[in-house]
Regions:
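Conserved N-terminal phosphate-binding loop of PLP-dependent enzymes in the Aspartate aminotransferase
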Residues: 1-417
Length: 417
């Protein structure tokens, strides 16, 4: 057990009671010197691993030139260079424009402002199992009450939730379409809805992929009703699914796009990108932030984009990762491990569901596996509505033998349930 400062709020939940000291690619070491294979990576922040040398070099070089300047006071070059790079990197028919933020949650908040200002509407439709942040407006979008919304009273809204259709959940496109239509008949007129926000692959919800048929219906539905479609790629973006962004798998494009996590290789940064016309009439000063677009974080992000811009390399990373996970999953099935449910997700964004033969989620078993795996030198992260799905978030750059070693540890823990 680690000893934490008593000045740290107990409202911060900690999955692994250890204190980390340093990391390299897919490994971390705690202050006692114990080494771990890292299948968490800051919860999807390190798609290219801990301390990638190119990223570290970019950070050092920029820190020696300028550590910070508030962009609203006087622009700095890394911000501008990064916005150009993002516009080229994001695969949309027309380049998106936008702003940099400190985090994904802040990107969500600013997207809501843009949507409400442009549509002159206030309602938002989100999805069961969604996670969009812990700030006040963002957390009301989350498709789960505990622990995010408990005891907070009325939250900014109105927000309405419908089922998330996915081959991973068993919820069909038709079921979600019917729920959406019912919403318009019973709860709120669609002419009052500013935006629909959705993750192409749910993160905290359990790495569940949005049904492609529904995604295309949703794009048409939003166009028909003057509703803005916000795609949250905070966790699924920057190569995690084998493409630059997960929306490429779905055959749609967003009106607004939320970015964060792996955008800057561990530096705090997010972005809210959108179609250019959405900013034309917004008041000067309505967007911004003191630390938003910090130059050191921008320098790191520029290097990340360079490293992820080669499509064949990116696809190979994700395919190799996916194939190894599938091979181990098939072995677990062949061994008759009854607690092992579905393999969720796509590319290198994969989840292992734990479920009993009678249908009960394996919440207690997952908690047990987290502890057992850590003792054996593997860090894992829970997800899912019942905390019954193991998130596999190793770096795309993980060595093959390290990935196999980690999956063998996981298999041993599954066999002990």
């Amino acid at each position: 057990m680690t000893t934490l400062s008593p000045q740290i709020s107990p409202a911060l939940s900690i999955v692994h009671p250890i204190t980390l000291d340093h990391g390299k690619n897919a490994h971390v070491w705690d202050t006692a010197g114990k080494q771990y294979i890292d299948f968490v990576c800051g919860i999807g922040v390190l798609n290219l691993g801990h301390c990638h040398p190119n990223v570290v070099n970019a950070i050092v070089q920029q820190a020696q030139k300028m550590t910070h300047y508030a962009f609203n006071a006087a622009p700095h070059q890394p911000y501008s260079l990064l916005m150009d790079a993002l516009a080229d990197f994001i695969p949309t028919q027309q380049p998106l424009v936008g702003m940099l933020t400190n985090s994904g949650a802040e990107a969500t908040e600013n997207a809501l402002k843009v949507a409400r200002f442009n549509t002159k509407r206030s309602a938002v439709i989100a999805f069961d199992g969604a996670f969009h942040g812990r700030t006040l407006a963002a957390l009301n979008l989350n498709g789960k009450v505990a622990p995010y919304k408990v005891g907070l009273g009325a939250l900014p809204g109105p927000v309405f939730h419908i089922p998330f259709p996915s081959p991973d959940t068993g919820v069909s496109a038709q079921t979600a379409i019917a729920a959406l239509q019912r919403l318009g008949e019973v709860e709120i007129g669609f002419d009052e809805v500013a935006a629909i926000i959705v993750e192409p692959v749910q993160g905290d919800g359990g790495f569940q992929v949005l049904d492609a048929e529904f995604a295309q219906y949703l794009r048409q539905f939003c166009d028909q009703h003057g509703i803005l479609l916000i795609l949250d790629e905070i966790q699924s973006g920057f190569g995690r699914t084998g493409k630059r962004f997960a929306f490429e798998h779905l055959g749609i494009e967003p009106d607004l796009l939320l970015l964060g996590k792996s955008i800057a290789g561990g530096m705090p940064l997010g972005a809210m990108m959108a179609k250019a016309e959405l900013f034309k009439t917004m008041p000067k000063g309505s967007l911004g932030g003191t630390y938003s677009g910090n130059p050191v974080a921008c320098a790191a992000a520029l290097e990340i984009i360079k490293l992820l811009s080669d499509a064949p390399t990116l696809e190979k990373w994700a395919t190799d990762y996916e194939n190894r996970v599938q091979q181990h999953y098939q072995q677990w099935q062949q061994q008759g491990l009854s607690i092992v449910g579905r393999l969720t997700g796509i590319g290198a964004m994969r989840g292992i569901e734990l479920r009993h033969p009678d249908g009960r989620p394996g919440t207690a078993e997952l908690a047990q596996i987290l502890n057992q795996a850590r003792e054996k030198g593997l860090l894992l992260m829970p997800s899912g509505s019942s905390r019954h799905i193991i998130r596999l978030l190793a770096p795309l750059t993980i060595e093959a033998d390290t990935l196999d070693h980690g999956l063998r540890i996981l298999g041993d823990c599954l066999a002990n349930c």
